[in-house]
């Protein structure tokens, strides 16, 4: 959410930003917000003036009564009553204008960084750099579910019976591999100086609307019926929410956190052949990174975050690339974002395995996350990035480390979590 003062003083900048995001239908919101802001300030000024008059008149009543000027005192009382009635209406109008203004401000997008490439959608995202050599082996790489089934490691049919489409049972070596990757990711981030958290897996609506746009909320979040609680789509939601309405001394910055959680997503609109199997699912687990920092440091930490993911995947011998998200692909709260994509030997292309985002002060403004410095308090900046999100990451892992005999190589960093195994062998 933008600062209303910034919008008031820079409406053309805000409108140009909306155009860059190809959301021209929102242009009218800028003028509406400015008009509502003016009405709101007028009402507040009228209220202040009337309260001052009321205070002055109330003092006069006592003096008039002391002078036995009863008629004048009664007239003053009537005036106070009239002012009170006017103030009631002003307070109602003020609340109405505040609500209408907030409604518009919440959907006006954050100002994107000037380095963000302009494009309509994800088809216009820009490749930044490749890490590792993408290899297509001479032998066939089966579909990831077939690889898992060769280890007797997945049961989609039973999951459909218990839960419906978009769920799965993992078992045996595949389940152990899944858990081992998460354990390695946890320790990988702890070794890089991040504090490990396991947060709540449900959050209140106040936090939901603080950490994401309404469009994201509608497409992602599952609501708990009868309660003001939502299942989280990522632990970023809980971790940022942890700091709602807080003021932290700036010398404690940055706060580097890494958090584990299950994630629950509707995945509205998911479709296509690669949505089969465990590519897009309603429930998965993830290790996340979250940073809260001073505004001037956020771009440096943004680069630190995506590099962590690249280093993690490369430590497991998986080729990846970074893809700069264009203006039209950025969610409304994001200032800048880069996807990390892993190589798929079977598909002969890259696919997303993580997303790194700098949200500037958008979440901090919505949630009241402030820092305290020598010159007073100010809004923090928030950033997040995926370390790893199996089972999607398992697709990249199994395809890239599959051997010709059907076994899967276990890279050295992962072996201590897999009981010392240097490979897992299919049972079918």
Question: What are the residue ranges of the model-derived segments?
Answer:
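TRNA-recognition modules of translation machinery and tRNA-sensing kinases, especially anticodon-binding
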Residues: 27, 130-428
């Amino acid at each position: 959410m933008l600062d209303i003062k910034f919008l008031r003083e820079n409406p053309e900048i805000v409108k140009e930003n909306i155009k860059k995001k190809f959301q021209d239908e929102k242009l009218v919101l800028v003028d509406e917000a400015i008009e509502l802001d003016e009405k709101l300030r007028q009402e507040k000024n009228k209220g202040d003036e009337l309260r001052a008059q009321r205070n002055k008149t109330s003092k006069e009543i006592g003096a008039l009564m002391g002078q036995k000027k009863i008629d004048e005192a009664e007239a003053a009382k009537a005036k106070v009553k009239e002012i009170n009635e006017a103030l009631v209406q002003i307070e109602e109008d003020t609340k109405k204008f505040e609500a209408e203004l907030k409604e518009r401000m919440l959907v006006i997008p954050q100002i994107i960084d000037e380095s963000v490439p302009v494009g309509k959608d994800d088809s216009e995202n820009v490749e930044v750099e490749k890490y590792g050599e993408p290899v297509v082996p001479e032998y066939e790489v089966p579909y990831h579910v077939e690889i898992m089934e060769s280890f007797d490691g997945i049961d989609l049919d039973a999951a459909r019976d218990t839960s419906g489409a978009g769920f799965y049972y993992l078992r045996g070596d595949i389940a152990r591999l899944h858990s081992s990757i998460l354990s390695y990711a946890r320790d990988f981030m702890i070794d890089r100086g991040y504090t490990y958290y396991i947060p709540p897996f449900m959050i209140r609506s106040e936090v939901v609307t603080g950490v994401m746009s309404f469009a994201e909320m509608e497409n992602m979040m599952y609501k708990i019926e009868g309660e003001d609680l939502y299942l989280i789509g990522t632990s970023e939601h809980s971790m940022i929410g942890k700091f709602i309405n807080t003021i932290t001394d700036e010398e404690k910055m940055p706060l580097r956190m890494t958090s584990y959680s299950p994630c629950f997503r509707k995945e509205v609109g998911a479709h296509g052949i690669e949505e089969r199997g465990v590519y897009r699912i309603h429930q998965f687990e993830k290790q996340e990174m979250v940073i809260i920092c001073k505004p001037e440091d956020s771009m440096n930490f943004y680069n630190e975050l995506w590099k962590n993911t690249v280093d993690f995947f490369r430590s497991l011998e998986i080729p990846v690339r970074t893809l700069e998200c264009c203006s039209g692909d950025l969610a409304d709260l994001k200032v800048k974002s880069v996807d990390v994509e892993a190589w798929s030997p079977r598909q002969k292309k890259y696919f997303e395995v993580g997303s790194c985002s700098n949200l500037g002060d958008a979440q901090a403004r919505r949630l009241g996350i402030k820092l305290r410095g020598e010159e007073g308090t100010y809004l923090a900046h928030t950033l997040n990035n995926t370390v790893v999100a199996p089972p999607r990451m398992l697709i990249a892992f199994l395809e890239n480390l599959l051997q010709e005999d059907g076994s899967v190589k276990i890279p050295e960093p992962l072996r201590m979590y897999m009981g010392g195994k240097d490979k897992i062998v299919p049972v079918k």
